[in-house]
UniProtKB/Swiss-Prot annotation:
Taxonomic path: Bacteria, Bacillati, Actinomycetota, Actinomycetes, Acidothermales
Top EC group: hydrolase
Cofactor, how bound (note): Binds 2 Mg(2+) ion per subunit.
Family the UniProt entry places it in: Belongs to the RuvC family.
GO-annotated cellular components: cytoplasm; Holliday junction resolvase complex
Protein name as catalogued: Crossover junction endodeoxyribonuclease RuvC
Length: 178
C-alpha cells in the first residue's frame, strides 16, 4: 500500500501569478501531478490613478509578502500574449517583470505559461472560457465553495498547470540535453 503514496520529495509548492497592474492574482498550491491542494489565494490591487512607480512598488510589496509567507519551490507566471490594447499588455508585462524580480531575489525559479497552455492543463481545452477555468480549478482543488475572482482562479490555474506539467517538462528538457 505504501507504494501508492507519493514520495514526500515529489510534493511541490507552486505560486501562480496572474500579472496585472490593477489586479494581480496570486494562488498557491501544494501537490504533485494529479493532486493539488489549495494553500492560499489573493488578489493584489493598485489604484488605476496612482503613479506607475507606486503601483509597481505596491505589487512588489505584496509579492514579497506572499513569497516569504508561502515559500514556494517555483513561481509560475502567465506569459504576456498579444492584445489589441498596448497599454494593457505593457501593464501585464511590467507586473510580470516585478514577479520575476521578486522571485529571483529570493532564488526561486520562475516559469512562464501561455494562457492556452494553462487552460489546456486544467480544462483539457486551450480555448476554454474563464468560467470553465474557474469551475475546474474549484473541482481540482476540491474547493466548490471557493469564492474568488477570475484573477485569483487564473493564478491558481497557473500553479496547477506548473504542478502537473512541470515535472514532465523538466524530464523532457533533461532528455533533450543528453
Amino acid at each position: 500500500m505504501a507504494a501508492n503514496l507519493p514520495n514526500m520529495r515529489s510534493i511541490r509548492r507552486v505560486m501562480g501569478v496572474d500579472p496585472g497592474l490593477t489586479r494581480c492574482g496570486i494562488g498557491v498550491v501544494d501537490g504533485y501531478p494529479g493532486l493539488a491542494r489549495l494553500v492560499g489565494v489573493d488578489v493584489l490591487h493598485t489604484p488605476a490613478d496612482a503613479e506607475l512607480g507606486d503601483r509597481l512598488a505596491a505589487l512588489e510589496d505584496g509579492l514579497v509578502q506572499w513569497l516569504d509567507r508561502a515559500a514556494p519551490d517555483v513561481v509560475a507566471v502567465e506569459r504576456v500574449f498579444s492584445q489589441h490594447n498596448v497599454r494593457t499588455v505593457m501593464g501585464t508585462a511590467q507586473a510580470g517583470a516585478v514577479a520575476l524580480l521578486v522571485a529571483a531575489r529570493r532564488g526561486v525559479p520562475v516559469v512562464w505559461h501561455t494562457p492556452s497552455e494553462v487552460k489546456a492543463a486544467v480544462t483539457g481545452q486551450g480555448r476554454a472560457g474563464k468560467d470553465q477555468v474557474a469551475f475546474m480549478v474549484r473541482r481540482l482543488l476540491r474547493a466548490p465553495g471557493l469564492a474568488a475572482p477570475a484573477d485569483a482562479t487564473d493564478a491558481l490555474a497557473l500553479a496547477i498547470c506548473q504542478l502537473w506539467r512541470g515535472a514532465a517538462m523538466a524530464r523532457l528538457a533533461a532528455g533533450g540535453a543528453r
